[in-house]
Amino acid sequence: MATELKEYLVIIPDLPDVLAKRQVLLKPHNQDAAPLVKAGRVPFFGSTLAHHSAEGQQVAENGTVMIIKAESEEEIKEIIRKDIFTIEGVWDFGKLSIWPFKSK
């Protein structure tokens, strides 16, 4: 019998001064995450911003927010731990926040 997946709101900030590295790693990060998105395990994701940028200016991304469907918080930590953004030093794993969540 499969364990029921629960929803979690996941917020993980970037380490300081990694915007250029984030941009270089974005394509492989998205490719690695695609199976989770396609399977419906990550129904929502996006970047947090230091501030809203004017049109034509570089977006000031400074982290990620997402909803992940998982069996446990430990499973989410393992997903984040294996992500290229964590491995290559974009995300600040020590500041990972995981909140039980219910979509409406």
UniProtKB/Swiss-Prot annotation:
Effect of a null allele: Impairs the production of fusaric acid.
One Pfam family linked to the record: YCII
SUPFAM superfamilies: Dimeric alpha+beta barrel
Pathway(s) annotated for this protein in UniProt: Mycotoxin biosynthesis
Applications: Fusaric acid is phytotoxic to plants such as cotton and banana. It has been shown to induce programmed cell death in plants. In addition to a mild toxicity to animals, fusaric acid exhibits acanthamoebicidal, antioomycete, and antimycobacterial activities.
Its biological purpose: Part of the gene cluster that mediates the biosynthesis of fusaric acid, a mycotoxin with low to moderate toxicity to animals and humans, but with high phytotoxic properties. L-aspartate is suggested as fusaric acid amino acid precursor that is activated and further processed to O-acetyl-L-homoserine by cluster enzymes aspartate kinase FUB3 and homoserine O-acetyltransferase FUB5, as well as enzymes of the primary metabolism.
Family: Belongs to the YciI family.
Name assigned to this protein: Fusaric acid biosynthesis protein 2
Organism whose genome encodes this protein: Gibberella fujikuroi (strain CBS 195.34 / IMI 58289 / NRRL A-6831)
Source taxonomy: Eukaryota, Fungi, Dikarya, Ascomycota, Pezizomycotina
